């Protein structure tokens, strides 16, 4: 008997919960432990500048722009911000492919300085 995955309840998930799903998916696909550790470290750093307890479907372009501004104001190096944004872009692209159909999520990787 096969078990179907239910997408109900997806709209109530926070950014952090969806990110955890992303990490599980990437681990299952065989990404190295070092890459997974980097993702976890980066989301921890990102959470200082972006509310990851916010519902995923409520994430806006403005939230990400405010995150970048906050990172710049806190004195983070350009390379650090770029690294965090690359991980976030990878996560947002995965989110789009996995049913998070906000038009913002698709547009974000081209419109933002990520």
Report each predicted region and the residues it spans.
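N-terminal core-binding DNA-recognition domain of tyrosine recombinases/integrases
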Residues: 2-6, 20-114
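A detector for short, charged/polar N-terminal pre-domain segments
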Residues: 7-16
